[in-house]
Amino acid sequence: MQEAGGSVRVSEAALTEIVRRAVASVEGARLRKGRRRLGVELQEGRASAELQLAVAYGRVLPEVSAAVQERVAQALARMCDVEVEAVHVIVEELDRP
């Protein structure tokens, strides 16, 4: 991001933490464990993300996924001042009750 007097960059670690906290705010959802659980692209004022989730067994998967998409998009837009083009969610695991 270009600002008056220089540029601002958001590290991958910071983006990961923003997404992790947004996902954690949705009841019944968590990021899947492992290295390839999420990817976030931030370019020229636009962002997109792909997340691999674990969802609590018995929850309505489309509802939980939609809530995650909304929270992640809101967090990235608010904290990084970007337009979020897409948040892709893949439910990879179900957690036992």
Annotated model-derived regions:
Residues R78-D95:
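A short amphipathic beta-strand at an alpha->beta junction
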Residues Q2-L38:
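N-proximal, solvent-exposed amphipathic alpha-helical segments enriched in charged/polar residues
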Residues L53, P62, A86-H88:
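Protein-protein interaction and targeting regions used for scaffolding, dimerization, and localization
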Residues V26-A54, V91-L94:
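Short edge beta-strands and adjacent turn/loop segments
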